Amino acid sequence: MKVPFSWLKEYVDIDVTAQELEEKLFSCGFEVEELIPLDAGISKVVVGKIVEMEKQEGTHLTKCVVDCGDYGHDIRISTGAANMKLGDCVPAALDGSTLPGGIKIKARKMQGVESNGMLCSGEELGLNEDLFPGSEVYGLLILPEDSVPGTDIAPVVGLDDYIFDISITANRPDCQSVLGIAREVAAILGKPLHMPAMDYKAVCEPDAPITVKVEAPDLCPRYMAHYVRNIRMGESPRWMKRHLALCGLRSISNVVDRKSVV
């Protein structure tokens, strides 16, 4: 079962690193098969702000001058993308950087013009639309306008996170959810568990168009059902899409996704 570190932090005030929490879970009998950093394979990729652009004659390339903060304010990088504009902030993989899949970026000439790195799409960073909006757009990943040039890309796009891949044993069905693991983490760290706030009001409607009949009360002494009206199908909120994506699930719709989360 995949459990995002960031999701656990929503339930518990965790004051240890992911690696330290992994050791504590092991010591309490949980088998953490793998601790996966979301930014695995990514190094020396920073926020770059495009300060100059010029179309390279006779090619599909655009020559860009990129402000990468402490790494340099006038780094020249060519790109074949066409969806950026002057002033945009984009991921810049600098000379000597690495990307997922073992890809190494080096300064080289593109159509005879020196390029000191690569401007990246969301896909090249291992992102998808559910993890970070705009990641599946054809072209470069356009970052928020307030992104600071030279900042490491991981926290900007939400890759500063870890996934605990935990094997749940048959005697711990209570831990087959993120909330179940969070409850254990709270106990391990001696911290309070912050349960999700409920802001809906249940109304008893005796004339609801459903009935529930338990035909074997000796086997099922209690059964509960909720009838929900006025549901509007649509997209799930961004936070829910991200939670599901981190657990390896794809967002489908607000109704289906809520069932997956619950």
Task: List where the protein language model places each region.
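Conserved small/polar residues in nucleotide/adenosyl-binding loops
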Residues: 259-262
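Residues forming anionic-ligand binding surfaces in small-molecule and nucleic-acid pockets
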Residues: 149-168, 207-246
